Structure formats: structure tokens, C-alpha cells
Amino acid sequence: MVEVFGIPIIAASKFADSGKLNHVASIMAELLDQDSDGCADDPNVLRNILIKSKGKVRPALVLPNKSVTKAASNAMKEKGFHYGQDLSFGEVLPKCSGLKFTTTCSDSSIEEQFHFITSFGHSRAYGQIFGTHWVDTSNLTKAMDIARYFLGFNFPY
């Protein structure tokens, strides 16, 4: 396990041995600190990511070999973490990141971590704008309804 700004990234040993854990951690750091000054660009987003759910556990980015098992999920809860987002070994392809991305070679590290930061950070910190729950009527969900042509229907996305 490593932490980036206090956010736990819990990884199977295969990740650490391959160097992929460092790749994922550096992307998390870049997403939260884009000006590279050593501080999260939006402390409100970081604070909300670090909030413990029900006062007991905090979300973690999980890097399993294949998928998160029930036993692994329970072990994380016992240590004070809960599964927030996963990123499997096969999805992390540093050789295919950035300008090396192609339609047949892509690294999912940015996308999956963006989901994590959005779900636990932006949507909590700025719910009126970035709320993502089914019952939210945030600017984001309204824009999603428009993009998916749900206007005039009582069926929000």
C-alpha cells in the first residue's frame, strides 16, 4: 500500500513488483496536484475524498491482480478501508500512456482514477455541480440528461 495525499492505494504484490504501483501513484498525484507544487490543487476535493464513510472506513483505490474478492473486501474493512474503485493489473499499461496511447494499446489508469476522484471528491465537495447519484439534480446530471435526449421524459439518467 502507498498513500498519495493520504489516499490509500492498496495493491496486490504483483503491482509493486512490476513498477505499476508507482505509475498509478504518480498519476493520482498529478491528477490532484496539476501545478506540481506539492499540495492538492483543491483542498476541498481532497478533504472529501478522505472523509470516512459512516465514521469507520475511508475509500481506497484498489489494485487487484484480477478482481476484488469478498475476502479481500472484508480484510480491507477490518483495516479501516473500503473498496472505492479498482484498477486491475491488465488495465495498467504504462507503455501505452500519454502520447503512446493507440486504439489497440491504452492505459486505463487516468480514467479509473478520475472516476475515483469524481465520485469521492468532486461530487461530495460540489454536489450541486458535480453530483453523480441517481437522485442528484446537479449541473452534471442535467447535462447528461440533455446529452442522452432524456428531456421531456420522467426518466433521468
Model-derived segments and spans:
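Acidic/His-rich structured neighborhood in mature extracellular/periplasmic domains
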Residues: 4-156
